[in-house]
Each structure stands twice: as C-alpha cells, then as structure tokens.
Amino acid sequence: MFSYSSSISRGVVDCTPELFYQVVRSEKVGKICAEIADAHELKMRGEMSREDFETFKSEHKKRLPVFLFHASFPNGRRISADAVPSGLSIFDLDHISTLPIPLLRTSEKSEGGDAGGHDSLENVLKALKERGCIGKSFSNLPYLFSPSSPIALIHISPSCEGLRFVFRLPEGMSLSDGQKWFAGQLGINDYDVCVKDYARCSFAVPEDYILYVNEEKLFSAPSSSLQPPP
C-alpha cells in the first residue's frame, strides 16, 4: 500500500485503485499538466527561456496532487520515521529531449495493450530502447517484460522531459540498492541517486501520460518472492 496527498503540504491517506484513477482522470490534473506542456512547447520553439520554463513548471507542479509510492503513513503525516514501506521504488529518466509527448498515442498503440488504452510493457520498453532512452545493448530486456518483471508503472513526467518508472523491489533491497539494481536492468549509468527517501513525493499526471500500468504489482502488498534475475 502506498499513500496519496492532495498537495505536498497536506496530510496523506492510503491510495486505493479507485482513488488513483480518480486523481489521474481529474480535470485539475489534466489542466495543470496541459499548461506545463504548452509552456514546454514554447521553450522548444525558443519562445520561452529555460529559466522561465523552470519557474513556470515549478509553480504549477506545486498545485498537483502527489503519490507517495515508497510507503504508506498510518499516522497521516508525510514523515519518513512513520513510513511503512510499500515494497515499491521509483526511478527517473530525466531530460529526454527526443521524447514525444505522449510517447505512444492511444491510436498508434499495438495489440497487447489494456482496456484503458495503456500499451503492453513489451511495446513500451522496445519503443524506449529504439529511441535511445534506455540502454541499447544489455541482456535483461526480455526479463523486464516477462511475467516476472518488477515494473508496475511507467509515466511521462509533468515536465514533459522525462519518464518515471515505479517498480517492485527484490527481497531485501533498500531503496538506494534498488535504484542501482534497476539502473543496471535498463542499461543506464547516470541516474538520480537521491531517490532514497520514503517520504518522497511523485506528482500526479493525467492518465494519457501513463504508458504502462500493472495494477496487481502497483497495489499488491510487498512480496518476498521477487528475486533479481540471474
């Protein structure tokens, strides 16, 4: 179980599947992210400076609800000392300048997706690999889209410049160890090593920013059965 808050400054509650979809389908989240996307387009066309875009993005993100994928907080406070680990971890790919938004539009998605318009994990990972977003030569790609895959969620970031992966930690791994392990699975050397706080927030995005979701992995209790590949 992980937590949800209506803003970075509010109390937190447990996030159910119903609440998760209510948030990503909300008019508020869609409107805020659309405004950020419009500003990103202006920046890409040279009509807004990088500095002005960063300010605009930061101010708008503060208005978004947040998920706390790393843990639940029974006391309703976003304090690491109160955290009950969810068994999930997040991994960010930042500043991907070649990333189309959204990467795979619903009308272009291949067979194998779900009823909600999200693509299959295999299709998403192969598309990311082809675009150079993840390692071009590594051996674990088949494992990542197998039934044993740890990946629960992949979505485009609110900034329109990156991706966020949510994945299940193998048994006994800390958040920092999990980051290093997952980077190796993706064939990536440079990543944000600061993602190790149980109280870290993940800003909500609209449902059409979600490239892949596995509800069973996202909402199930921590499992001791997930093991790293050989």
Q: Model features per residue range: what roles?
A:
Residues 1-107, 111-161, 168-176:
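Signature for HUH/AEP ssDNA processing cores
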Residues 133-136, 183-191:
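A common structural junction motif
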Residues 155-156, 166, 195, 203:
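A structural signal for short, well-ordered beta-strand segments and their strand-loop junctions
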Residues 171-172, 186-226:
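Catalytic "initiation/cleavage/transfer" segments centered on a nucleophilic residue
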Residues 177-182:
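Alpha-helical scaffold elements adjacent to nucleotide-binding pockets in ATP/GTP-utilizing enzyme cores
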Residues 229-230:
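Acidic, low-complexity intrinsically disordered tails
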